[in-house]
Amino acid sequence: MRKIIHVDMDCFFAAVEMRDNPALRDIPIAIGGSRERRGVISTANYPARQFGVRSAMPTAMALKLCPHLTLLPGRFDAYKEASRHVRDIFSRYTSLIEPLSLDEAWLDVTDSPHCYGSATLIAREIRQTIFNELQLTASAGVAPVKFLAKIASDLNKPNGQYVITPADVPDFLKTLPLAKIPGVGKVSAAKLENMGLRTCGDIQQCDLAMLLKRFGKFGRVLWERSQGIDERDVNSERLRKSVGVERTLAEDIHEWSDCEAIIEHLYPELERRLAIVKPDLLIARQGVKLKFNDFQQTTQEHVWPQLNKEDLITTARKTWDERRGERGVRLVGLHVTLLDPQLERQLVLGL
């Protein structure tokens, strides 16, 4: 049985700002783009969250909820340096590390000799070391599979951890809301609940063939996760191949103008995320994703040398007109595919 830890830094960007400027600690702050540029919030500290400010929220909405919010543009060099330090701490315990972003990662400590081989003690020691060396807090989840470790890391935030032992898995899953499974958004959860499916226990009673017919590949994922099945390894070789941002909508949209407005809100966040890993914004391809209210989705992309909003809007309009039909749209996403490092090196050498 594997021992997987998911470590998630608490309000990471905001926490770095509060550490470096103690005057920010007790006031609502958020990192994000300006209201004038239709920016979105990257993260907010806990005082801001008490007003309802959340990640991926349009800045204009955040300022309506919290007019005295202190908005910071972000210092991504500082965040990347803190992230590198955290990764160094991880590497003291295992070489099997799979980063999801600057502020979270999976660790496989199945064969780690540290802390008598106890994943619970390793997670606790990692969190304490992060605090001692960076004055930042982290939360952790411990479980036998990746998706449960990720869910567990969110159950005792901030600065805590939650352990799901192999013996705990059946009872934990029985009452686990489907909305907690990564990839199941609010709209999906609502549609499932309309079918009488609210928990993993409900899915356990379903026929897999029915789920496949109703939801396609998504149905298989639901069934497997509800059984506690997640065969994905912690992939330490993983290289980031793409950057994306998407929004699951509270209500389906049927008008192109609504879709275009969402793209306008999403684009600054895509630009910000890409700048962290590719400051020159050079890419291989860019594209859009639309997910419809029948759970089908479509992706359209093409070769493009640099991030470009107008091209994304044109691509989205073409996709909207040609593939939507009469269906409502429940998710809009933007993404870019990064240049292969070897190809990029060849291009640079050739200049």
Curated annotation (Swiss-Prot):
Cellular component, GO annotation: cytoplasm
HAMAP family for this protein: DNApol_IV
Protein name: DNA polymerase IV
The family this protein is said to belong to: Belongs to the DNA polymerase type-Y family.
PANTHER family: DNA POLYMERASE KAPPA, DNA REPAIR POLYMERASE UMUC / TRANSFERASE FAMILY MEMBER
Annotated GO biological process: DNA-templated DNA replication; error-prone translesion synthesis; SOS response
Quaternary structure and interacting proteins, as annotated: Monomer.
Record-annotated site: Substrate discrimination: F13
One GO molecular-function entry: magnesium ion binding
Cellular localisation: Cytoplasm
Function, as annotated: Poorly processive, error-prone DNA polymerase involved in untargeted mutagenesis. Copies undamaged DNA at stalled replication forks, which arise in vivo from mismatched or misaligned primer ends. These misaligned primers can be extended by PolIV. Exhibits no 3'-5' exonuclease (proofreading) activity. May be involved in translesional synthesis, in conjunction with the beta clamp from PolIII.
Chief site of localization: cytoplasm
Gene name in the database record: dinB
Organism: Salmonella typhimurium (strain LT2 / SGSC1412 / ATCC 700720)
CDD domains named in the record: PolY_Pol_IV_kappa
